Amino acid sequence: MATSNEAGSVLNRVPPLLTDLYQMAYAYWRAGRHNEPAVFELFFRDNPFGGGFSLFAGLSDCLLFLQNFSFSDDDVQYLRSVLPADTDAGFFSYLKELDCSCVSVSAVPEGSVVFARVPLLEVSGPLAVVQLLETSLLCLVNYASLVCSNAARFRLAAGPRRRLMEMGLRRAQGPDGGLTASRYTYIGGFDLTSNALAGRLYGIPVAGTMAHSYITSFSSLEEVWPQTLKPCGGGDSIDFICLVKGLLGRVCQLLGSKTNLIREGELAAFLSYAIAYPQNFLPVIDSYSVRCSGLLCFCAVALALFELQYRPLGVRLDSGDLCRQSLDVRRVFRECSKHFSVPQFESLIIVGTNSISEQSLSELNKKDNEIDVVGVGTHLVTCTRQPSLGCVYKLVEVRGRPRMKLSEDPEKSTLPGRKAVYRLLDADGHPQMDVLCLCDEAAPAAGVELQCFSLLGNSTLQCSITPAQVSSLRTQVFSCGQITLPLNSASESRERAQISLQMLNPYHKRLQEPHNYTVALSERLHSLVSDIKKGNSKGSNFLLSN
């Protein structure tokens, strides 16, 4: 279940004024249409990153936003100052009383695998109110789903064994972008974050290493203070510097390395850090030279920690050929483990970071390497391959009548009417097809052949399918101003995402040239679309948009 920290984070970031000014719905109110019952759908048109799927995220934030939607007196006063001077004063009184008590929402569960053209949210209620919600809901879903999907692709590229750490806060588009990224990359499959606030708010495991600046700030062993460390089990303090210097000589002798190439400042930094964090010692070892200094200093300090009954964690590599260096580091770990009779030494963690992208992670996975944890920042949180998911929020029904946008760009046409969404599964539980039906149609049945029309770009193709299993994809999550289901925590949504991805066929999960997943229309919905296009449907409408 979501924590109070998560709820507070959303409420502080997403007030009702987080919307486009043109959404203020004054014209609806002026025409007396503001209370007409209406239905909108939120969906995206194309799967992101050239892939075969997306993950739906942002639902919890949307529901918290809806539950607390109301304009303050200060909000209304500000709107008075920016709307035209001749705006009817009654409209501002209307805004003061506005809330979502008459709004209902059905949604796909957060963390679910979803596909293009499938309505993720159905929002129904008074026309002016549900129109006012458009920008905020899009803002909450677009980036969350995009970065969550990006994280899932990184997870697929990395494979199940390797741990992934999100460390993109300093590269993100502002603090809110960084916080959102930390949460939704965790849901998408990352294991850790470097973002301390995200750890506090969302319960995400937090990890970190050492900055290069910490190492380069030292130049001499004389700067190390304190110079002693007590054994983990208690007892008198040990001269840690003396212990490490003795071990460093033995390490260099074992490996045939030259002691005169070791950077004293790097050794001093490692000593100081180990004394401060004896249970979490994981330094970056490439500030100068991995082979000639960083790795040697680490081994000496780590062996000293083991001798005092502490358990160092490992090292981080942040430049150069990560695969080759990781193999060299692991070889040295094994030699030290055997020579110094410290079995745990050979299994110390190796973290790799260095502007990791999905492509470089896939390439890394094809080569021999000993990297246990990969840290990803820029390419993850900024979604460099695609900056936006492109979710849209479109009117599909007013006063019980279907509405359809007919566009000069066929890709921007919408599907009319209130719908139910079903996922058809094969005998192994793999999704085969998502079918959109009108809400008053009977649900597809397992073992019964279904005639439908698959969406192929801007056209449709008649097809038939006999599903082994059928599941309804959406459930009601908001009604009468209240959230109707417990909100999932980040870890609960993450678990759903993992299960949902495991169920997906491998050929839909391929990072390159995946098979297209079929989304189809029922026969009745297809007929409605055809009738409206021909102008034959009662109450049909034609909205042209460039």
Swiss-Prot record:
CDD domains: NAPRTase_A. This is Nicotinate phosphoribosyltransferase. Its EC number is 6.3.4.21. It is found in: Cytoplasm, Cytosol. Keywords: Cytoplasm, Ligase, Magnesium, Manganese, Metal-binding, Phosphoprotein, Pyridine nucleotide biosynthesis, Transferase. One of its GO terms (biological process) is response to oxidative stress. Transiently phosphorylated on a His residue during the reaction cycle. Phosphorylation strongly increases the affinity for substrates and increases the rate of nicotinate D-ribonucleotide production. Dephosphorylation regenerates the low-affinity form of the enzyme, leading to product release. Belongs to the NAPRTase family. It catalyses: nicotinate + 5-phospho-alpha-D-ribose 1-diphosphate + ATP + H2O = nicotinate beta-D-ribonucleotide + ADP + phosphate + diphosphate. The modification Phosphohistidine is found at residue 212. Activity is highest with Mn(2+). Nicotinate binds at residues 22, 209, 316. Pathway: Cofactor biosynthesis; NAD(+) biosynthesis; nicotinate D-ribonucleotide from nicotinate: step 1/1. 5-phospho-alpha-D-ribose 1-diphosphate binds at residue 378. It comes from Danio rerio. GO terms for molecular function: metal ion binding; nicotinate phosphoribosyltransferase activity; transferase activity. Its main location: cytoplasm. Its cofactor is Mg(2+); Mn(2+). GO terms for cellular component: cytosol. It is an enzyme of class 6 (ligase). Catalyzes the first step in the biosynthesis of NAD from nicotinic acid, the ATP-dependent synthesis of beta-nicotinate D-ribonucleotide from nicotinate and 5-phospho-D-ribose 1-phosphate. Helps prevent cellular oxidative stress via its role in NAD biosynthesis. InterPro entries: Aldolase_TIM (IPR013785), NAPRTase_C (IPR041619), NAPRTase_N (IPR040727), Nic_PRibTrfase-Fam (IPR007229), Nic_PRibTrfase_pncB (IPR006405), Nicotinate_pribotase-like_C (IPR036068).
